[in-house]
Design a protein with these regions (language model features):
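Primarily a LysM-type cell-wall glycan-binding module
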Residues: 244-273
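Substrate-binding clefts and substrate-entry loops adjacent to catalytic sites
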Residues: 68-85, 117-124, 132-174, 199-214, ...
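An acidic, Gly/Ser/Thr/Pro-rich helix-cap/linker signature
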Residues: 2-3, 11, 17-102, 107
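Extracytoplasmic
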Residues: 89, 93, 102-108, 112, ...
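Extracytoplasmic/secreted proteins, especially bacterial periplasmic and envelope-associated proteins
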Residues: 64-68, 82, 86-89, 93, ...
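Short, functionally critical alpha-helical segments immediately adjacent to catalytic or ligand/cofactor-binding
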Residues: 103-119, 179-186, 276-279
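Catalytic and substrate-binding regions of cell-wall glycan-acting enzymes that process beta-1,4-linked
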Residues: 34-73, 122-124, 132, 136-137, ...
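Beta-strand-rich binding/interaction modules
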Residues: 262-287, 293-299
Length: 316
């Protein structure tokens, strides 16, 4: 491996232009301040370029993307490190599903900039979960959202719904950048921006940059933020990040009777109630719904113990 060397970010732009990556965010637009970040970035050019050449989304590193790179390396560095740690919980699962669909794997970082990979994240606009679905959109893509179960907070179910949505948007616009923008702002606003800018149709990633000034303010930062996150997260050690990613949750599922508290399952298994909550963040009242049995996630290899205990005493 070549020895990392420091190069100006402008040089990084030239090196990175042929690379590939992808898009999205739901947090409020943030100030693009870069105070305190030096112009020199540690970046092993040959190694990082080779590593990223196989990705599928076109990577454009321009001034807007550079600002987010500097921000993640500067004042938001600690937060970005936390995101990298939490990626270990769900990143493998999301990548597997992206591969199965033939979608760009870097769409994984949509979840990073949406929620920091937190299934309990909630926005001021009441979006929720790893993928920050609003309630109506979640229901439209098959997720249950009621007073007992909120599948926006289920990383597995919500990932399937989010990828369905992104595939639909990509089919409509022919561009992952525009699909990302539409995920953030809505397809209607992207269509409006296309009309106002006089651009005819989609199908080209460069169109996002052509219509960017006609998009809502938050959406103007959306794709640049994702591209910066993907660039750093794909090769974090090249940018000086030394993190140990969390281990993924390994679980079985077991059908549990109505109104069963998660704490009871925890007692049966002699595990902490917090572990059961972490495995089942979508059970928002800490128990199965009163009107139906429900599939509950339990630590891998423990499902038979739960089944046996509940069979002996289903109403304890």
């Amino acid at each position: 491996m070549s020895t990392p060397r420091t190069i100006p970010i402008r040089r990084l732009v030239l090196v990175a232009l042929p690379l590939t990556i992808g898009s999205v965010v739901t947090a409020a637009a943030l100030t693009e301040s870069n105070r305190g970040v030096q112009d020199e970035l540690p970046f092993p050019v040959a190694d990082a370029t080779e590593a990223l050449m196989d990705t599928r989304l076109p990577m454009e590193v321009n001034d807007r993307v550079e600002r987010w790179v500097r921000r993640f390396l500067g004042r938001d560095r600690v937060t970005f490190e936390e995101y990298l740690v939490r990626e270990g919980l769900y990143g493998g699962m999301i990548r597997d599903r992206l591969r199965q669909r033939g979608m760009p794997e870097q769409l994984l970082y949509l979840a990073m900039i949406e929620s920091g990979f937190s299934p309990t994240a909630t926005s001021p606009m009441a979006a929720s979960g790893v993928w920050q679905f609003m309630g109506p959109t979640a229901r439209a893509y098959g997720l249950t959202v009621d007073s007992w179960v909120d599948e926006r907070r289920d990383p597995v179910r919500a990932t399937d719904a989010a990828l369905d949505y992104l595939q639909e948007l990509h089919g409509e616009f022919g561009s992952w950048y525009l699909a990302a923008a539409a995920y953030n702002a809505g397809a209607g606003r992207v269509k409006q921006a296309l009309r106002r800018s006089g651009v005819d149709g989609g199908g080209d990633e460069q169109i996002y940059w052509q219509i960017i000034e006609h998009l809502p303010r938050e959406t103007r930062s959306y794709v640049p933020k994702l591209l910066a996150a993907a660039l750093l997260a794909e090769e974090p050690e090249h940018f000086g990040f030394e993190v140990e990613r969390s281990l993924p949750y390994l679980f079985d599922q077991v059908l549990v009777p109505p109104s069963t508290p998660l704490r009871r399952v925890a007692e049966i298994l002699e595990v902490s109630p917090s572990l059961m909550t972490e495995l089942n963040p979508h059970l928002i009242r800490g128990q199965t719904p009163p009107d139906r049995s429900f599939m509950v996630r339990v630590p891998m290899g423990t499902s038979q113990a739960v089944v046996a205990a509940l069979a002996r005493n289903p109403r304890r």
